Swiss-Prot record:
One GO term of the biological process aspect: isoleucyl-tRNA aminoacylation
GO molecular-function terms, A-Z: aminoacyl-tRNA deacylase activity; ATP binding; isoleucine-tRNA ligase activity; tRNA binding; zinc ion binding
Intervals of motif 'HIGH' region: 58-68
Gene Ontology, cellular component aspect: cytosol
Residues spanned by motif 'KMSKS' region: 605-609
Protein's recorded name: Isoleucine--tRNA ligase
Gene: ileS
Length: 940
């Protein structure tokens, strides 16, 4: 064999079999940076139609986690695929740099502002901290292979950005959407600040659940309104149920549902006979809860018949009215709701209708104010026990028990929050029809998955006014002057805000905090108070449509796509929508796509304590970023995304299949120059045209899947193409032709041409996902080409077959189905030990008429398709009894271990081996290929 080895066209390439991604990717990244790949991509795309994916800013705090990696990789896949589709697809990354988490980390190092450090120095420390965090995160994002304008990202703490946020707030004020009010807001005692909806998370909490008597002051009037024929005996009370006893000091009313039925029940519930007003739909279970005895219904009435009746507060010397509210329901409690407008949104809304006092006896530290009777200075949650004790002493506690329920917590501190009425600045949801307009814009937007629309609609329909003010040091200021007497904004507010914005452009937010009012207001300064609040960070990020999309030349409004995690329906998607609609009346995006959260293999949330955290840095350092990218693409991101070391290892196995396919194509293109050696499609062998047709059809599916953001389908299709269409069929069949025919023969050049076209297409299919690997493949492809695969577009030189042409798809579908059926029979014979490989076999095929004609068309080349030494075709009626029925209807086969000698060059067993005097070890075909004019192939 040694003397014939040099006559074979064996595959050869410098493209490494071992990926060593963890070592090679950083080198590729340096190359991209040195060549300014993103800049070249921008230049190459100039003049194309634009596609704008707007980056929602991650928070500049801490190392990136697997969720960050998912988000950035998905965005990068989309941007790169859009570029390949012929779009100008810029990507400008950004960071959210203000807010509480940064403050808390800086506090740990330098202390609280105003105590251990002055506020200006504290803000400088926050800015320095955020900048370091941005740099660390940027390094990791780039390492993931994400292409973007990393040299010029947007930062919400940039002076220009801060100034533009102020200008945007000015526009919202001019449109009439801002108002100041005393409203109950989510308040974190540990933060010392109001919280946005998106900063609240719900956790299980155990609370005291108590039933409280509110004695009826006007008993006779209540009996009259209920048309009670028998007055009954004992004290009369309306009973409420609450899990927040600490809100009772602020009680201003008891709410009933106007349309619900209520019953007045006489019973014994531990204090002798008494009369209790309860909802008819709940009274049985309520009385059972009290272990009440001898219950008698005295009267029935509707809630709206009792409006305005006076009740006695359970421990203060004041009366409170019965009011009506649609928020009252029969899900739990008694059907009567304790109402404290200073401590709850529903209470606030109904209280406003009745002009109730918005009483807030709780300070920002979570303790009752000094003037609060009975409970002054007590922390509210600890005061629960004291309040319950007072209720017992007053005889107004009916029942006490513990209840585990879902309760709002601060997302940062993980501690229970309170509802607390404070003076705050709000974007009013009703003024100028903001809520209605926002809902209309939601309907005009495409949401993927579709349930996202219903989710955000429900949130916008039911959300309260947006509290945009915070009592923090590190944030964009709300630069307003309020009249000391009237509370009204300065009449020249728009001009003043623009002046402040100009100063902030030069000095940052410190320009406002250092500003003396007289610098802008002159003699009017003593009459006005300078607002010290800062903006909710969700306002900062929510106005990137004006501060980034509108201000950067390569971008524009609306963006084509916003893409974030599904938690952003109540976060960035919503804040962006509301601010954009408030300013320009339209949504800032055409489409919104959301991805699920990452969980471990068992669907559990990741946590260090569970030991199931997958850190992207570790994956990049071991398996490589491309494995992480392939996992993201392979997973249906619309639901939860399972990841673990084992899952990533399986992905790495799939990666090797695709890499090996690319390597095999490259190895067989050694010495091939497409401009010199390329064979026109019409002159190519039939099987090669079939392979190109498969690639052409697949490319259509892949481009469509990229268009539809179905990346997991791309992974499935490409992997299947590499494993089946290429590995199991085409490359397996042409191996003989590629290795044994003459180097410059049409048969070999035809196969090389097909492999060249397939490689050109494959490298582009892979590029958005396996970015490092695709660019590595690109460097080894023959022919002239640009510096990077990312500077090109989808490959367009893939010819396709017709369905019914003589050698069209229908023909090859039949042939390859027969091949698969025969291969299974051959495998059975091999397992039995009768043959070593399929080339040790001869097959006699007995077939029905339609299949007979198709197989006969291939003539002697059928054996190359089946990879057997002989393949003979006979009509089905001639089949012997030993013929085996295959899985293909109308096809039987007899497998015969060949007794002919084996050609040492092509390994086929042929009758004529040994008949050539000079080459006794070769078959006639190999003699022709080594000494003659070369064999001729037509089909395979």
């Amino acid at each position: 064999m040694a003397k014939y080895k040099e006559t074979l066209n064996l595959p050869k390439t410098a493209f490494p079999m071992k990926a060593n991604l963890a070592q090679r990717e950083p080198q590729a990244l340096k190359r991209w940076q040195a060549m300014d790949l993103y800049g070249k991509l921008r230049n190459a795309a100039r003049g194309r139609p634009r596609f704008i994916l707007h980056d929602g800013p991650p928070y500049a705090n801490g190392a990136i986690h697997i969720g960050h990696a998912v988000n950035k990789i998905l965005k990068d896949i989309i941007v790169k695929s859009k570029s390949l589709s012929g779009f100008d697809a810029p990507y400008v990354p950004g960071w959210d740099c203000h807010g509480l988490p940064i403050e808390l980390n800086v506090e740990k190092k330098v202390g609280k502002p105003g105590r251990k450090i002055d506020v200006a120095s504290f803000r400088r420390a926050c800015r320095d901290y955020a900048r370091k965090q941005v740099n660390a995160q940027r390094e990791d994002f780039e390492r993931l292979g994400v292409l973007g304008d990393w040299c010029h990202p947007y930062l919400t703490m940039d002076y220009q950005f801060e100034a533009d946020v102020i200008r945007t707030l000015g526009k919202i004020i001019e449109k009439g959407h801002l108002h100041k009010g005393v409203k109950p807001v989510h308040w974190c005692v540990d933060c010392g600040s109001a919280l946005a909806e998106a900063e609240v998370e719900y956790q299980e909490k155990t609370s005291p659940a108590i039933d409280v008597r509110f004695p009826v002051v006007e008993e006779v009037e209540l009996l009259a309104r209920c048309k009670a024929e028998i007055p009954g005996a004992g004290p009369m009370s309306v009973v409420i149920w609450t899990t927040t006893p600490w809100t009772l000091p602020a009680n201003q009313a008891v709410a009933l549902h106007p349309a619900l039925k209520y019953v007045l029940v006489e019973c014994s519930a531990g204090q002798g006979r008494e009369r209790l007003l309860l909802a008819e739909g709940l009274y049985r279970e309520v009385l059972a809860r009290y272990s009440a005895e001898s219950a008698v219904i005295l009267a029935t009435c509707q809630g709206d018949e009792l409006e305005g009746l006076k009740l006695q507060h359970p421990f203060y010397e004041r009366t409170v009215p019965i009011i009506l509210g649609e928020h009252v329901n029969l899900e739990a409690g008694t059907g009567a709701v304790h109402t404290a407008p200073g401590h709850g949104q529903d209470d606030y809304v109904v209280g406003n209708r009745y002009q109730l006092s918005i009483d807030n006896p709780v300070g920002g530290n979570g303790c009752f104010l000094p003037e609060t009777p009975l409970f002054a200075g007590e922390p509210v949650f600890k005061a629960n026990d004291h309040i319950i004790q007072v209720l017992k002493e007053r005889g107004n506690l009916l029942r006490e028990q513990s209840l585990q329920h879902s309760y709002p917590h601060c997302w940062r501190h993980k501690t229970p929050i309170i509802f607390r009425a404070t003076p705050q600045w709000f974007i009013n949801m009703e003024r100028e029809g903001l809520r209605t307009a926002a809902l209309a814009e939601i309907k005009k937007t495409r949401w993927l998955p579709g349930w996202g629309q219903q989710r955000i609609e429900g949130m916008v329909e039911n959300r309260p006014d947006w509290c945009i003010s915070r009592q923090r040091a590190w944030g964009t200021p709300i630069p307003l002057f309020v009249h000391c007497q009237t509370g009204e904004l300065h009449p020249d507010t728009p001009r003043l805000m623009e002046e402040v914005a100009r100063r902030v452009e030069e000095k940052g937010i410190e320009a406002w905090f250092e500003l003396e009012p007289k610098e802008l207001l002159g003699n009017q300064a003593p009459a006005y108070e300078k607002v010290g609040d800062t903006l909710d960070v969700w306002f900062d990020s929510g106005v990137t449509h004006t501060c980034v999309l509108e201000t950067r030349e390569e971008l524009g409004v609306p963006a084509d796509l916003y893409l974030e995690g599904s938690d952003q329906h109540r976060g960035w998607f919503q804040s962006s929508l509301l601010t954009s609609v408030a300013i320009r009346g339209t949504a800032p995006y055409r489409m919104v796509l959301t991805h699920g959260f990452t969980v471990d293999a068992k669907g559990k949330k990741m946590s260090k304590s569970q030991g199931n955290v997958v850190a992207p840095q570790q994956v990049m350092g071991s398996l490589g970023a491309d494995i992480l990218r392939l996992w993201v693409a392979a997973t249906d991101y619309r639901g939860e995304m399972n990841v673990s070391d084992e899952i990533l290892k399986r992905i790495a196995d799939s990666y090797r299949r695709m890499r090996n396919t690319a390597r095999y194509l490259l190895a067989n293109l050694n010495g091939f120059d497409p401009t010199i050696h390329g064979v026109p499609a019409k002159d190519m062998l039939a099987l090669d045209r079939w392979a190109l047709d498969r690639a052409s059809l697949l490319q259509g599916e892949i481009v469509q899947a990229y268009e539809d953001y179905n990346f997991h389908l791309i992974y499935q299709r490409v992997h299947n193409f590499c494993a089946v269409d290429m590995g199991a069929i085409y490359l397996d069949i042409i191996k003989d032709r590629q290795y044994t025919t003459q180097a410059d023969s049409r048969a070999r050049r035809s196969a090389q041409t097909a492999m060249y076209h397939i490689a050109e297409a494959l490298v582009r299919w892979l590029a958005p996902v396996l970015s490092f690997t695709a660019d590595e493949i690109w460097q080894y492809l023959p022919g002239e080409r640009g510096e990077s695969v990312f500077l090109t577009t989808w490959y367009e030189d893939l010819p396709s077959l017709g369905e019914e042409a003589p050698w069209g798809r229908a023909f090859w579908d039949v042939i390859l189905a027969a091949r698969e059926a025969i291969a299974k029979v051959l495998e059975g014979v091999r397992v039995e030990g009768r043959i070593g490989s399929s080339l040790d076999a001869e097959v006699d095929l007995y077939v029905e008429e339609s299949l007979y004609q198709a197989l006969r068309k291939l003539g002697d080349e059928l054996r190359f398709v089946l990879i057997t030494s002989y393949a003979r075709v006979y009509p089905a009626q001639k089949r012997p009894v030993e013929a085996l029925e295959t899985e293909m209807p109308g096809l039987w086969t007899v497998v015969i271990p060949s007794h002919y000698p084996k050609c040492v060059r092509c390994w086929h067993h042929r009758e004529e081996v040994g008949s050539h005097e000079d080459h006794p070890e070769l078959c006639s075909r190999c003699v022709e290929n080594t000494e003659g004019g070369g064999e001729q192939r037509a089909f395979a």
